[in-house]
Amino acid sequence: MDWCGPWRTWYKEHLFTPAQAVQQIKSGQRVVVAHACGEPSIILDALVAHAAQYENVEIIHMVAMGKAAYCQPQYDKNFHHNAFFLGGSTRAAAAEGRVDFTPVYFSEIPSLLREDLRPNVTLLQCSPPDAHGYVSLGVSVDYTKPAAEASDLVIAQVNQNMPRTLGDSFLHVTQIGCLVEADTPVIELAPPKIGDVERAIGENVASLVRDGDTLQLGIGAIPDAVLLFLKEKNDLGIHTEMFSDGVVELVEAGVITNKAKTLHRGQSVATFLMGTCRLYDYVNNNPAVAMYPVDYVNDPYVIGQNDNLVSINSCVQVDIMGQVVSTSAGLRQISGVGGQVDFVRGANLSKGGRAIMAMPSTTGKGKISKIVPFLDQGSAVTTTRNEVNYVITEYGIAKLKGKSLRQRAEALIRIAHPDFRDELTAEFRRRYPRDY
C-alpha cells in the first residue's frame, strides 16, 4: 500500500493495540457495540479484560453474537448492559435483573442514538480502507453507521476478512479515532436445521409468493424453509433487514433477479447480514447488493415503495383475534421487536403487499398451543390484530385481512394443532354463541 497522502498519515497515527484502544473509554460513558456478526470481539475482549478500571460503563447492543462477558455478575459494578434485543447470551442476565431492556422499533434506533441515547463511544468492525480512505462496515450497517456518526469516539477493528459491502455502508478513516488491526474470522451463523414442521410451513408460505414479488425474510428455520420452496418462482426481489446463505442459493439459481422491483431495481437491499463465508464472499464488492442504515431500509414508507412486498416473520403466540406476541412469554422478555413491525406496516403500505406471520402450531414438545384464546398474562403485543394479513402453521393458512373477529377465530382454529382445537372451539362458542 502507498502510505502517502493525508488519510494514510491519519491511519498510521491512530493505530492502537486493543488494550490501548479501550484505555480511551472512561467510567460512566455510554458505549454502543456494532450489531450481530459485525461485533468487534477482539475489542470487547480487551474491554472486559480491563474491567477493573471502569465503573458504570453503559453498553448498548442489539443482537450479541459473542459471549457478552460484560453481562456476567462479577462485572456488575463495571458495566451496565442496555439491550435493544435479547438473545442466548443476554436473556438469563435480563431475567435476573442485571440487564436492562429498552423496547424500540429497529427503524427508530438511529434517531434514539442521535437524540436520546447519544453514545460517547462506538465499537465496530470494518474492512481495510480503499485508495480513498473509506472503510466498509460490511455485514453490519444498520444502527452501526448512525451510532458512529453520532459518537464522540469510534474504535474500529480493521479486518481483512470483513466483506466490503456497497451502498451507504462507508466511513472515512478520519472519522475513526482508534484503529485496531486484527484479521479474525467474521462471526458466522450456521444454517438452521429444517424439520418436517418447518418444511410444511415453508411450503404453505411459498404458496402465497408470486413471480415478481419482493421479499422480506427473518432469521431462522422457517424463513430458510420458505426459500426451499421458491425454486420454481421467477424474478423475485429482496428488500429485507437481513438475509443469509439461502438467498445466495436462489440468486445463483436465477430465481432472485430483482428485475421486477419498483425500488432499487437490480439490487438486493438489506441493513445487516448473518451467515457463513459463502454469504460473505458473495456480498464482497458486489454491486447487486446494497447495504443501507436501518432507518432507511426499515422505514415503512420506504418499504411500501416496493410493490408486491411480502413480509415473512415468526412469532411466539397468536390469540384468536389475531394479536401477535413475538418478544415475550408472559412477563419474561425473550427477544425484541427487531424489524417485524416495520415490515408488517411496510407490507400494508405496499401495492399488492402481504404481511405473513408463520409459526409452528405448538411449542414445548407439542404440549403448548401457540394459537390461544387469550394471550399469556403480561405478554406484550408486538403486532396488532389490525396489521396481520395471514397467519400460517404447518396445518394451513388463515387469512385475517378483511375478516371479522368471528371469522378470524374460525380461521385460526382451523390451522391450530388438532389436539387443541376443541379447547379453542369451546372458547369460540362462549364468545360467539349465535350461528350465522
Predicted regions and their residues:
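Conserved alpha/beta enzyme-core scaffold
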Residues: 1-436
